[in-house]
Each structure stands twice: as C-alpha cells, then as structure tokens.
C-alpha cells in the first residue's frame, strides 16, 4: 500500500474537483439552450434527443464537426474567451443548414493543459449563445485536462452538431442548372478560417493585440479579429420554409478555400458559377490584411470569405420571393452571379474585389 506521500492525480496535474466545479458552473448556461426534443441537462453518460418531440416524421440525420483553428490562439493571448464558443457552434451548424437540415443538438470538446478558473465557463457562455442563435440544444461535452500535451493554459476546441431534415428536403437539389441565380449573404468579418495567415500578418505589422484596430475605429485589434462568425441558420430555415421546395436549390458555407473550393461542392459536374466581384461589399479588415501582408487577390479569394459567408443558389423565377424572405428574416442578400455551363474552372470571376 502506498504511503501518505504517494502520488495523486492532482499532483500529476489533473484536478478532478476543478472539473466538477466547472460542470456545476455551466449547468445554467446549458439549460438556457433547451428546445423541443431536449431538456438540455448534463451530467449523465450521454445526451438524449427526441426526434418525434421536435416535430419530425421521416427524418434524415445530418452531422457535422469542426473547430475554430488558430483563432483560438488570439482568444488565449488576449484573455477574451466569451465569444470563441459562438465561432465553434457557427462552424458546425452552418455546415448543417446548407444541407437543408435544422440543427438540433450540439456537443463540445474542450482540451487544455490546465483548467483555469473562469475560462471554461466563459467558453461555454459563447457556446450557449451560439446554440441559442442556431436554435439547437447543448446536450453534452467533454472537458479534458491534459498536462504535458498542451502548454500551460493553452486550449483547443472541437464541436459536434447533429440536425435533421424530412426525407426529400435535403440540399442541394438535383436541379441546379445554367441560368440559376446566385445570392450572397454578408459575413461579419474573417469568421473562423485563415487565422494562421492572419496571425502571421499581425506579427509582421508589429501591432500588439491591444492596439487600436486600423480597420475598426474604437476597437482593439484583438477584439476586432475575434468578431464571432455569423450563424445563418434561422434566416435560411425561414427562407426555405417561406418559399417552398425548389426555390432555393443549393447553399454553400464559404469557409477555408473561399469561393473556388466551396462552391464546387454543391454543383453538378457539368455546371459552374460566374461571380461578379464588384457586387461584394468587402469589410475593411480584408483590405488591411491584403495590404499589410501583400496578399494577392487570388490568395485572398482562396483563403478568406472576403465579405460573403454564405451563398444561395436560386431558381430564377423565384429570386424575388427568396430575396424577400431573406430580408424579412433580417438578411441583406446581394446578387453575386449566375450558374453557367462549366468552363475551364468551376468558378470564374469578373469585376474587381474592393480591397
């Protein structure tokens, strides 16, 4: 039998009591995400969801998982942790809604070298806010304290979301064809991809995170770059329901890879998309990044959303109805281009990006 001075888990760097205290602290946040089908209680071995109570009769489940990349490093270095969870939810639920599905529930994974009081709860504050924006329940998660694997209080996040659509309602439809029109929905800024390049540019600029943001008066550089990813779930679901099957033919979440890599994911082999860059209202952050980093336009287009976080492919005869439904839901759609026969590249560009 080990003596009184034998090793303990706490001595090895894992504080079970701190983990339990965090779970208790976040329970009210989790409960705030309750919705039909989920009571949003945590602490059991698994989370439960009742599809019938959510109103589905013949559903297809849609699952997605993602992270926030090195944007999390800015949260760590600035000490601001209460919005990065919104990004985490957004990256998952936006990938679900583009398939015509309603996000239903979310789970998170928070891994760190050392649990710091208040940090985990701040992260979950953002996750709960993201879930409320998306209308999905936070039904579980994992907090992993792993000394030696992460440096000090560094952490990483992963999210997992599941949604559902009635059979026959999934997107894209098989009817995407030349002549269809392409709408764009504005982004809030950089969103959650390209941050390894963002951080390299900031380092080259010599500006600290608390310096005034050159592109956002009244905000610090770190605060401006931590602007949360937009969650498009509610306006898109509202537009899909208001306009009926066939009006919206496809949706594309513009993340890493930009327009060139994400648009072909929802297109049939024989068609492409022609985009008018003059139609894009580019947020000032992208101009600053391009100028400060000397980043060429093709690299900007393949790394960042450049001001458009979601693309909507619409039947031309229904374009006014879709635009009206999106505006009624609080969106500001812009006409970006058209679906064309596929040329040399699946995505072609005209006009000039206003960097």
Swiss-Prot record:
<dbReference type="GO" id="GO:0005829">
    <property type="term" value="C:cytosol"/>
</dbReference>
<comment type="pathway">
    <text>Purine metabolism; IMP biosynthesis via de novo pathway; 5-amino-1-(5-phospho-D-ribosyl)imidazole from N(2)-formyl-N(1)-(5-phospho-D-ribosyl)glycinamide: step 2/2.</text>
</comment>
<keyword id="KW-0436">Ligase</keyword>
<comment type="similarity">
    <text>Belongs to the AIR synthase family.</text>
</comment>
<dbReference type="Pfam" id="PF02769">
    <property type="entry name" value="AIRS_C"/>
</dbReference>
<dbReference type="Pfam" id="PF00586">
    <property type="entry name" value="AIRS"/>
</dbReference>
<dbReference type="InterPro" id="IPR010918">
    <property type="entry name" value="PurM-like_C_dom"/>
</dbReference>
<dbReference type="InterPro" id="IPR036676">
    <property type="entry name" value="PurM-like_C_sf"/>
</dbReference>
<dbReference type="GO" id="GO:0005524">
    <property type="term" value="F:ATP binding"/>
</dbReference>
<keyword id="KW-0963">Cytoplasm</keyword>
<protein>
    <recommendedName>
        <fullName>Phosphoribosylformylglycinamidine cyclo-ligase</fullName>
        <ecNumber>6.3.3.1</ecNumber>
    </recommendedName>
</protein>
<dbReference type="GO" id="GO:0004641">
    <property type="term" value="F:phosphoribosylformylglycinamidine cyclo-ligase activity"/>
</dbReference>
<dbReference type="GO" id="GO:0046084">
    <property type="term" value="P:adenine biosynthetic process"/>
</dbReference>
<keyword id="KW-0658">Purine biosynthesis</keyword>
<dbReference type="GO" id="GO:0004637">
    <property type="term" value="F:phosphoribosylamine-glycine ligase activity"/>
</dbReference>
<keyword id="KW-0547">Nucleotide-binding</keyword>
<dbReference type="InterPro" id="IPR016188">
    <property type="entry name" value="PurM-like_N"/>
</dbReference>
<dbReference type="InterPro" id="IPR004733">
    <property type="entry name" value="PurM_cligase"/>
</dbReference>
<dbReference type="GO" id="GO:0006189">
    <property type="term" value="P:'de novo' IMP biosynthetic process"/>
</dbReference>
<keyword id="KW-0067">ATP-binding</keyword>
<dbReference type="InterPro" id="IPR036921">
    <property type="entry name" value="PurM-like_N_sf"/>
</dbReference>
């Amino acid at each position: 039998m080990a003596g009184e001075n034998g090793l303990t888990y706490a001595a090895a760097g894992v504080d079970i009591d701190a983990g339990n205290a965090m779970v208790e602290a976040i329970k009210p946040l989790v409960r705030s995400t309750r919705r039909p089908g989920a009571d949003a209680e945590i602490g059991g071995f698994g989370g439960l969801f009742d599809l019938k109570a959510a109103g589905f009769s013949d559903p297809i489940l849609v699952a997605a998982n993602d992270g926030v990349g090195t944007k999390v490093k800015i949260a760590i270095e600035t000490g601001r942790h209460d919005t990065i969870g919104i990004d985490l939810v957004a990256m998952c639920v936006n990938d679900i809604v583009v398939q015509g599905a309603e996000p239903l529930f979310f789970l998170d994974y928070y891994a760190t070298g050392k649990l710091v009081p208040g940090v985990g709860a701040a992260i979950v504050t953002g996750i709960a806010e993201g879930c409320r924006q998306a209308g999905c329940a936070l039904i579980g998660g994992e907090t992993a304290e792993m000394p030696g694997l992460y440096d000090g209080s560094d952490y990483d996040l992963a999210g997992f979301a599941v949604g559902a659509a009635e059979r026959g309602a999934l997107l894209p439809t098989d009817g995407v064809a030349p002549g269809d029109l392409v709408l764009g929905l504005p982004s809030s800024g950089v969103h959650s991809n390209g941050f390894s390049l963002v951080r390299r540019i900031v380092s080259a600029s010599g500006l600290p995170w608390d310096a005034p943001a050159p592109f956002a008066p009244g905000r610090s550089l770190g605060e401006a770059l931590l602007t949360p990813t937009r969650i498009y779930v509610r306006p898109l679901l509202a537009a899909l329901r208001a306009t009926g099957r066939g009006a919206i033919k496809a949706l594309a979440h513009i993340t890493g890879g930009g327009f060139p890599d994400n648009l072909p994911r929802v297109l049939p082999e024989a068609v492409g998309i022609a985009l008018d860059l003059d139609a894009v209202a580019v947020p000032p952050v992208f101009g600053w990044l391009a100028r400060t980093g000397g980043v060429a336009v093709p690299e900007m287009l393949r790394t960042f959303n450049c001001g458009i976080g979601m693309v909507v492919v619409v039947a031309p005869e229904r374009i006014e109805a879709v635009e009206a439904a999106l505006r009624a839901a609080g969106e500001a759609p812009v006409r970006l281009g058209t679906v064309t026969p596929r040329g040399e590249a699946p995505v072609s560009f005209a006009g000039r990006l206003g960097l």
